[in-house]
Curated annotation (Swiss-Prot):
A cellular-component GO term for this protein: extracellular region
Residue ranges of the motif Cholesterol binding: 515-516
Gene from which this protein is expressed: hly
Gene Ontology MF annotations: cholesterol binding; toxin activity
Protein name: Listeriolysin O
Main location: secreted
SUBUNIT field: Homooligomeric pore complex of 35 to 50 subunits; when inserted in the host membrane.
Length: 529
C-alpha cells in the first residue's frame, strides 16, 4: 500500500526528478527511499604536507580509531516501551452505539539510516560535522567534537552543474565555513543553471503509521518525533480508550543533497595539531566511537496528524485516499470519514521565512498543503531535514536500530436497532421475541444476558403494531409468532420462527392472512454492517 501511495503522490504533485543518478552503496535495508543522494561522494582534496610530528599524530589517531573495538550494529539502538500486561477487552454505551474496544500487543523494529532534523537541533547539523556515535545521537542531540578540522570537499546534486561546479573545497571545515560553502553552491546554481531548470521537482519521501503510543512513533520516525509531537499533540489517551483514530505521516520534499568526501583515513578529518590524547580526553572511545555527517538532505518537511472519531475499519483507507487524492465518490463510508476528519500539519522549510508553520484544517484541504513546495526555487529555500552519519573508522553507514512494544487499540461500534411488528391477520396472534445482550467483565470475558420482550405470549388482535428497541450489543435475535386456528386438533399454528437473526437498524416483521393460510414477511431497512 505504501508503494501505491508514493506513486499516487508522485504522479499528482511532482514530475519525475530531472537528474537520475547512479546508485551508491546499498542502503535499501535501511529504507532510505531516496532521502540521501545516491551520487558518488566527491574525492578528498589532496593532503597538505605534514611535519614529522604532525605525521606522528596522524598515524596515532588512525591507529587508535581503527583499533576501536565495537559492534556497529549495537552502537546506536533505541529501546522503547516493553509491554507486560495487555488491558482486557471492554464495551461501553455511547449514545445510540455500543462500542467494543480490543487491545493487542504489537512490536515495531525499524532501521533508520537517516536522522530527521527539526529546528531545535538544525544548528548542530551540517555536512562533515564530527560527532560521537552514542545515545545522544540516537536521541537526535548529536555531540559534536570541538576539534580543529582539516579540509574537505562538498558536492551538491542539483541538475545541470558541470565542470566541477557542483563541488567546493572547504579548507577549514568549521560549521560556519561549511554552511557558507553550501550557500555558495546553491547560489552558484541559482545564478548559472536555474534558468535552464526552472522547475526542479522535489524528491518525495513518504512514510505513515497509525498512532497508538509515543514510543511506537519514536521507533517509526526517530526521536525527532518527540519535538514534533509538542505541536502535533497526538491524542494517545483518546486513542487508548477507542474514542479516536489518528495517523501520523512524514512527508518530505527533498530539493537537494549535500555530500561529503569519504576520508581515506580517519586523521584526514582532523586538523594537523589534533592528537590522540585530545580525542581520548573528549571521550572518544569504543563506547563513543567517532562518526561524521556524510550527507544532509535540504528541503521541506511536513508532519501530518490525521484525526477522526470514527470507529470504522476503513479509516486507514480513507486517510490514504485523502493524502493521495484518490476519488472516493463511489464509497459513502469513505466519503463520510473524510468529511468528518481533520488534520494538523507541522511544516519545516519551503518558505522564505525562517519559521515553523502549524496549520489546522479539514481533510479536504490537505492536498493544498502537500502541493506547496513541490519545486525548488529562491522562494522555496531548503532547510536541513535529514542527515546520514558514517563511522569514521571505516566509513560504514551508522544505522540507528529502533524497537518498541506497544498496545494496538481497535474499536468497533454497533448501532442500536429496532424490530417493527405489524399484525393485520384475521386471527388472534401471540409473539415470542428474545435476544442476548453481550457485555464484558473486568477480565474481558463475555457476559451474556438473555432478554425477552415484555409482551411475549400475550394475545394480540388485528390491527396491532409495535416497535421493540434493541441496544447495539444485542445478538442472536429470535422472532416467533403463532396464530389461533380455532381447530380442535391444531389450536395454534406457527406463522414465523426465525432464529439467530443479526441486529439491524430496522427489521420489519409483518403477519397477515387467514387462520388456515397465515402469511408473514421479514424485511430489513438500512442493514448495519
Amino acid at each position: 500500500m505504501k508503494k501505491i501511495m508514493l506513486v499516487f503522490i508522485t504522479l499528482i504533485l511532482v514530475s519525475l526528478p530531472i537528474a537520475q543518478q547512479t546508485e551508491a552503496k546499498d542502503a535499501s535495508a535501511f529504507h532510505k527511499e531516496n532521502l540521501i543522494s545516491s551520487m558518488a561522494p566527491p574525492a578528498s582534496p589532496p593532503a597538505s604536507p605534514k611535519t614529522p610530528i604532525e605525521k606522528k599524530h596522524a598515524d596515532e589517531i588512525d591507529k587508535y580509531i581503527q583499533g576501536l573495538d565495537y559492534n556497529k550494529n549495537n552502537v546506536l539502538v533505541y529501546h522503547g516501551d516493553a509491554v507486560t500486561n495487555v488491558p482486557p477487552r471492554k464495551g461501553y454505551k455511547d449514545g445510540n452505539e455500543y462500542i467494543v474496544v480490543e487491545k493487542k500487543k504489537k512490536s515495531i523494529n525499524q532501521n533508520n539510516a537517516d536522522i530527521q532534523v527539526v529546528n531545535a537541533i538544525s544548528s548542530l547539523t551540517y555536512p562533515g560535522a564530527l560527532v560521537k556515535a552514542n545515545s545522544e545521537l540516537v536521541e537526535n542531540q548529536p555531540d559534536v567534537l570541538p576539534v580543529k578540522r582539516d579540509s574537505l570537499t562538498l558536492s551538491i546534486d542539483l541538475p545541470g552543474m558541470t565542470n566541477q561546479d557542483n563541488k567546493i573545497v572547504v579548507k577549514n571545515a568549521t560549521k560556519s565555513n561549511v554552511n557558507n560553502a553550501v550557500n555558495t553552491l546553491v547560489e552558484r546554481w541559482n545564478e548559472k543553471y536555474a534558468q535552464a531548470y526552472p522547475n526542479v521537482s522535489a524528491k518525495i519521501d513518504y512514510d505513515d503509521e497509525m498512532a497508538y503510543s509515543e514510543s511506537q512513533l519514536i521507533a517509526k520516525f526517530g526521536t525527532a518525533f518527540k519535538a514534533v509531537n509538542n505541536s502535533l499533540n497526538v491524542n494517545f489517551g483518546a486513542i487508548s480508550e477507542g474514542k479516536m483514530q489518528e495517523e501520523v505521516i512524514s512527508f518530505k520534499q527533498i530539493y537537494y543533497n549535500v555530500n561529503v568526501n569519504e576520508p581515506t583515513r580517519p586523521s584526514r578529518f582532523f586538523g594537523k595539531a589534533v592528537t590522540k590524547e585530545q580525542l581520548q580526553a573528549l571521550g572518544v572511545n569504543a563506547e563513543n566511537p567517532p562518526a561524521y555527517i556524510s550527507s544532509v538532505a535540504y528541503g521541506r518537511q511536513v508532519y501530518l496528524k490525521l484525526s477522526t472519531n470514527s470507529h470504522s475499519t476503513k479509516v486507514k483507507a480513507a486517510f490514504d485516499a485523502a493524502v493521495s487524492g484518490k476519488s472516493v465518490s463511489g464509497d459513502v463510508e469513505l466519503t463520510n470519514i473524510i468529511k468528518n476528519s481533520s488534520f494538523k500539519a507541522v511544516i519545516y522549510g519551503g518558505s522564505a521565512k525562517d519559521e515553523v508553520q502549524i496549520i489546522d484544517g479539514n481533510l479536504g484541504d490537505l492536498r493544498d498543503i502537500l502541493k506547496k513546495g513541490a519545486t525548488f526555487n529562491r522562494e522555496t529555500p531548503g532547510v536541513p531535514i535529514a542527515y546520514t552519519t558514517n563511522f569514521l573508522k571505516d566509513n560504514e553507514l551508522a544505522v540507528i536500530k529502533n524497537n518498541s512494544e506497544y498496545i494496538e487499540t481497535t474499536s468497533k461500534a454497533y448501532t442500536d436497532g429496532k424490530i417493527n411488528i405489524d399484525h393485520s391477520g384475521g386471527y388472534v396472534a401471540q409473539f415470542n421475541i428474545s435476544w442476548d445482550e453481550i457485555n464484558y467483565d473486568p477480565e474481558g470475558n463475555e457476559i451474556v444476558q438473555h432478554k425477552n420482550w415484555s409482551e411475549n405470549n400475550k394475545s394480540k388482535l388485528a390491527h396491532f403494531t409495535s416497535s421493540i428497541y434493541l441496544p447495539g450489543n444485542a445478538r442472536n435475535i429470535n422472532v416467533y409468532a403463532k396464530e389461533c386456528t380455532g381447530l380442535a386438533w391444531e389450536w395454534w399454528r406457527t406463522v414465523i420462527d426465525d432464529r439467530n437473526l443479526p441486529l439491524v437498524k430496522n427489521r420489519n416483521i409483518s403477519i397477515w392472512g387467514t387462520t388456515l393460510y397465515p402469511k408473514y414477511s421479514n424485511s430489513v431497512d438500512n442493514p448495519i454492517e
